[in-house]
Structure formats: structure tokens, C-alpha cells
């Protein structure tokens, strides 16, 4: 079992196969409900999980479990069940306190409180309620190492630190000088003093962008009704959780006041269950730390170098971005002035940065805090960093066991239905015109049959059919044999073949997210058409007859792009023959086929062994692929696209 620690309150569980913090290939069910956040496609730690005082059982099933549990039970599944108030009554609680210690964060108090109350009014009616609260200080990420492994430090011109934010914004200062000369804002010939050198903006540390508070508040409640004198039960369960944490995805995100809720109705007996529930999330005050720093940097004071010129005018002429351009212009002017004064190139760079940084907002000041709050409350990524999301999942499951009708085997059938409603107002998904809705459904059956004396040999066979409205149907069979040896059946040998699949996640299909130096684009055809952006063309490009701006949509990334590796080879050699089309394909459902051989045995009263050997074979594996799309020309034309 792998546990990836993203932050103090956010741990991602995985068993077999590939995973990141955003583990969309592992399912966690709490009393039959998937506790994944609709916007993220994975559980946000234990935000909506159980309190420790209400845990009845936890079962971990490694490997593909799609035959019974459907899409995404790919690497494994964690089944968690809470205590029923008919069986567990009374008031109980738990309090834990300790210290977290880190060189960057120091020593900080950690507190964790859980309270449970259950009451049985009669043999027909029972209720319960739970409350949990956790408070601590999150781990501080403070690495200044260059994220591209170039060995650069903050003293270098193009440093992009792992936990320095805002320095993602960079440009070639020679191009800046040429633009300024072309606009008449700098004397002709000044561009000859400026080297072709990429320079990045001065960034902010993570401690300047978040307070690193780790907090979780959650509550759940349930009403359970048994109208007859048997195990027939009708129940309603509600769950609510909110908290603050840090999430590491493509960028670094401050998750603040993120809220999730679930509401479930279930009817069950010994032979069947029918449940339906809704999961809803709200991004609260969550924000992107990278864009927070980028847009704080854009609150740059007026420059004496360019009186009467607006940053929008500079942006229209090809400088990096509205709000950054004056900084780079000031850098160039400071560099040129120092060079004319006899400075070395290194001294001129220092003079240029010093001149440009004279106008930045200093962390820790009241002005900085005011601007930061303005940025993190604005969802427009050109000047803000706030996430907006209020997505929902509607889900239903049913199952029937024929144990009262069939005595020669254990046979059950079941099915599920899920409806997605994605609503990020265009800040995460390409839902610019309203919520994105789509559905998937599935049915399954399983047979378990015992053979030989005392039914020591057991055959289990299952099959499931699932259909997502964007893809062809998937059939996932599973078959296994287990044999119990020994006088007391204390040696279990098992052999199994199973299949699993994972439908592309909501982000795989519909994401349309700006992450600074790149754009994340999902591969749904509708998403590709909806993702449309305008980009300024440099003066060199305009000299080739290209307009001052171009419009690209998501299709460009898939159908007109170069592979990053080939562009790197071209940049190093200047040989355009090395450029290659990216060849990126649309996502399809992932599939895995697994063969497993295992043994579990109790060798003595105090010693037991559980071991397994397995092999997984994957197809249609989904991953993020970086590509470079030219602003003009067609990939393979050997002309404009190369110049771009």
C-alpha cells in the first residue's frame, strides 16, 4: 500500500499501478458512497470521510475491481463502513494532540477531535451524529531549486524555482528592446546593447502566498428506520465537510474553505439494496498560488522610463503580458544604461533587475496583503487566481442476491448510474456557456460456486458492462479460483484473472486551465471547440505578414503542434528537419488485464503470511503530454511554423 502525502490533511492511497497525488485510479467508498470531489475526481484526503470514533470496518482490495465496482476501480478500492446506531449507541469521543516538526515550519501543535453519538429510540428507529475537527500547521514547501534541473539559483537571469512563484513569467529581453525601439520608446540602436537572454520576473516564496493552516471540519448525521421485524432498513445519511489544505497539481493550490456535502437515501435487506446519493462541492476561497504571485507582480507601479504609455499598448505589440511588460521594459532600460556606463554584462543584469524591482510590491507590507486579497478573490486569471466551482455528481446503485431462490450457487446482479454536472464558470473546465452534463451506466453479475469436499475449492466468476455516453461500451470479466488446504482450512491458495477500466476523468475530457507557461486542455471534441484564446504576435511575426494577434482553439494542440523534445533538438542545432508533429491522440478508456497468484495462511497462533505475485498489462493509458503549438503556419510546412 502506497500513501502519498500531499499535505498534512491530504494523503492519497494507492495499491497497484501508477498514481499521483490526484489518484483517479483508486476508489474509496464510505458506506457505499464515492467520496471523490466532483471537480477533482479524487478524494480530498479525509475531508468527507469518517471520524475515527464511527469506524466499523475498513477493507482494502488491491488490484482491478471493475467487474463489481465499475469504472475507476482500476488500481484498487477501499471499502469503509460506519457504525449503525441500532447496534452501536451512546456517546463516545477521542482527542489527540501532538507536535509537527519541520525545519522550515518549526514546531507546531496538532489537534484532532472526534465525537460520536448514537441513539436507538426503539427497534424501529435510531439516529446518529458525528463531528470531527482537526487543526495544525501544514508542511511548508520552500525549495528554491530550478524546476527544470538546470542548476540555476535565484541569482540567475532565468531562474524558475520549484517553490518560487511568479518567476514563471519570462521573455527574451532582446525582443523587448526591439519592440521598444519600434514603438519609439527607446532610441534606435539600443537593441544592439541587449543580449538575446531569457529573463524571468522576480518571484515570491510560498510562505508569502499562504498561511499554511491545515484545518478540517466535518459532520455527518443519519436516520435509520426498520418498519418490520427483520433487517429491512430505510435510511437517510447526510455528510458535510470543509477545510483548508495545500494541493500539489500542475501548479500549487491553496485549498481554503473548500466544502463538500453528500446526501444519501438507501433501502436494503439481506438480499438487496438500492441507494441513491448526490455529492456536491464548492471551491470556496481556493486559489492558484502561481497565478496569485503572477498577478501580484502585475500590480507594478508606474515607471518613469515610459511616461504616457500603457501596458496594454505594449502587450498589443508582443510583450509578454499586460502588466508584466513595463517591468521588462524597465529591465532593458536599466541594463542599457548600465552598459553605457561601462558595467559588465553581469553588472548590467543586476542593474536592470534592481531598476525593475523598484516598483514591485514587497511581501509582508499592508499594500501587499491588500493586493493579495484582491487577486485571490478574482476568478479572471489575467488579474486574479480564484477558483470557482459548484459541481455535482448524482449516483445510484442497486444489487440483488438470489440466495433465497438459488441454493446451488451464490448469484447476484446489480447496476449503477451516474450523472455529472460540472459547473466551474470556465475557471477549471470549458463550461463557459453553462454546466457540462453527461452520464454513464453499468450492469453486472457475479456467480460464486463451491466444489469438492467441504467446498474447499471456490470458483468466482463476474462480468460487467459499462457505457459512458462519449465512448463505446466496456465489458470487464473476472474469474478466480481459491483452494483452502489444511485440516483447519488455514492455508488459502488463489489464482485469478481480472480486468479493469477507467473512463477518462472529467478533467481528461473538459479541462481548460491556464497554468502559466502552458494550458491544460481536455480532449472532448466540444471542449476543444470551446477553448478559444487570442495571442499577440511579435513584430518579427507581423513582418512576415501575420496579423498582430491570432486566435487558437483546443484543436490546435492536438492537430497542429510539435513535440517538446523535437523543439528542444531544433533549438540546440537549428536544424528544422528535427521538428516532429506531436501526434497526440484523443483519450480513450484505460484498460488493464491482470493475472494474480497468491497465498494466505496462518502458520501459528501468532504468525500469518499473505503474499501475491501479479502482472498488469495496460492499454490506452492516459497521461498529460506537453506540446508546442505555433502561432502561425502548419506543422510540417517547413516554413512559417518553423519561424514561429
Q: What is the role of each PLM region?
A:
Residues 1-34, 56-57:
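Extracytoplasmic beta-strand/coil segments of soluble accessory domains associated
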Residues 11-17, 26-29, 43-48, 60, ...:
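N-terminal periplasmic accessory domains that precede
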Residues 17, 115-119, 219-225, 263-269, ...:
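Residues on the lipid-exposed face of transmembrane beta-strands in outer-membrane beta-barrel proteins
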Residues 34-62:
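Short acidic/polar hinge/loop motifs at secondary-structure boundaries
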Residues 94-256:
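Periplasmic-side early beta-strands and strand-to-turn transitions of outer-membrane beta-barrels
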Residues 97-101, 133-137, 227, 238-244, ...:
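Transmembrane beta-strands of outer-membrane beta-barrel pores
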Residues 264-471:
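Face-selective signature of the C-terminal outer-membrane beta-barrel domain
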Residues 526-643:
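Membrane-embedded beta-barrel scaffold of Gram-negative outer-membrane proteins
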